[in-house]
């Protein structure tokens, strides 16, 4: 290995170093967020290890319980939820947690409380575990006004109030994508070091894309604007080439591809799910936050996604997110329908 390659190998930007550098830019910072993030990262490493060993360790399969969404809990879901709840509480920096797996919010014991609220889906896309498809953890972080008198209202904030959001994808590699409100960066877990290394600095989504990502099995139940947009993707009338359909069925994997390559991810409302399918707090908001930070847009069919004010912790919403121009097209179709109504 030549000297230049060796220097590159040893001068690594780890996620801890990155966050400490960000912290040093804010003189008022006391390091609380850095500590919180280190516990989130630890949870991601643990779950990554468990996912990789799932088949051998008999973690695949049903655990005999059901979660608040009505789905049967898979063993890895249960384990992942326990890991993140314990990691977040033990950080001493959280006061309230909302998990996709738990019906009620978790209020942290006053002796361990900090100033942050964390919303998370510990293992999104877990129905794909058996076939080896990429799955992931999604999280968002808010700050509360008064950690000693925290209420559920602290969680029911619009997404634009988030301090940070991210996801960790467990696939051919373990990739953590993070935004602390000043751009988006991607880190890949180096198994030999046990550290997340900066591999995708300052991610920017292309302004236009050639890929659309949607479950077309629901097409017969879609509304007019969604149907028109997808038809235009497949049969463009302006001489352009049709867009390619790519749909994995794991939100983390589909959004990750959209973020890197451009295009649009759609999970619209339909007759079967008039309020949409994805949960606002720990799916729609974190992914919308990341998209906007990367130069894209996120839209619910009625408004900017991050302006939505949730009223319930497991509230659902339609979502269209991705490249700026693609989401702009969807917005124009909804506006046109509203004008003719």
UniProtKB/Swiss-Prot annotation:
One of the GO biological process terms: sucrose biosynthetic process
Keyword Magnesium set for record: yes
Coiled-coil regions listed: none
Keywords from the UniProt entry: Carbohydrate metabolism, Cytoplasm, Hydrolase, Magnesium, Metal-binding
Compartments, record wording: Cytoplasm
Catalytic class of the enzyme: hydrolase
Residues involved in Mg(2+) 1 binding: 100
Binding site for Mg(2+) 3: 121, 124, 283
GO annotation, cellular component aspect: cytosol
Pfam families: FBPase, FBPase_C
Residues the record lists as binding substrate: 124-127, 215, 247, 267, 277
GO molecular function: fructose 1,6-bisphosphate 1-phosphatase activity; metal ion binding
Family: Belongs to the FBPase class 1 family.
UniProt-recorded name of the protein: Fructose-1,6-bisphosphatase, cytosolic
Organism: Musa acuminata
Source organism phylogeny: Eukaryota, Viridiplantae, Streptophyta, Embryophyta, Tracheophyta
């Amino acid at each position: 290995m030549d000297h230049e390659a060796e220097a590159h190998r040893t001068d690594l930007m780890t996620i801890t170093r990155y966050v400490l550098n960000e912290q040093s830019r804010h003189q008022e910072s006391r390091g609380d967020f850095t500590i919180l993030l280190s516990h989130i990262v630890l949870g991601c490493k643990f779950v990554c290890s468990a996912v990789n060993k799932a088949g051998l360790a008999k973690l695949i399969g049903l655990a005999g319980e059901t979660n608040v969404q009505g789905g049967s809990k898979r063993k890895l879901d249960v384990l992942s939820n326990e890991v993140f709840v314990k990691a977040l509480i033990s950080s001493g920096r959280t006061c309230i947690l909302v998990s996709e797996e738990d019906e009620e919010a978790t209020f942290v014991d006053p002796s361990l409380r900090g100033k942050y609220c964390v919303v998370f889906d510990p293992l999104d896309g877990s129905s794909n575990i058996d076939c080896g498809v990429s799955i992931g953890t999604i999280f968002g972080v808010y700050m509360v006004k008064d950690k000693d008198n925290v209420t559920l209202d602290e969680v029911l904030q619009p997404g634009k109030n988030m301090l940070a959001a991210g996801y960790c994808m467990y696939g051919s590699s373990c990739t953590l994508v993070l935004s602390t409100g000043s751009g988006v960066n991607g880190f890949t877990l180096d198994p030999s070091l046990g550290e997340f290394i900066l591999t995708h600095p300052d991610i920017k989504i292309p302004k236009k894309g050639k890929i659309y990502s949607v479950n077309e099995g629901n097409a017969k139940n879609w509304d007019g604007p969604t149907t028109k947009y997808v038809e235009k993707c497949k049969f463009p009338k302006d001489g352009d080439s049709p867009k390619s359909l790519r749909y994995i069925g794991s939100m983390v994997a589909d959004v990750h591809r959209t973020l890197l390559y451009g295009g649009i991810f759609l999970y619209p409302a339909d007759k079967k799910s008039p309020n949409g399918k994805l949960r606002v707090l720990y799916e729609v908001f974190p992914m919308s936050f990341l998209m906007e930070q990367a130069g894209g847009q996120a839209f619910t069919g009625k408004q900017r996604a991050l302006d939505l004010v949730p009223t319930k912790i497991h509230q659902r919403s339609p979502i269209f997110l991705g490249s700026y121009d693609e989401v702009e097209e969807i917005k124009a179709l909804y506006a046109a329908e509203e004008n003719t109504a």
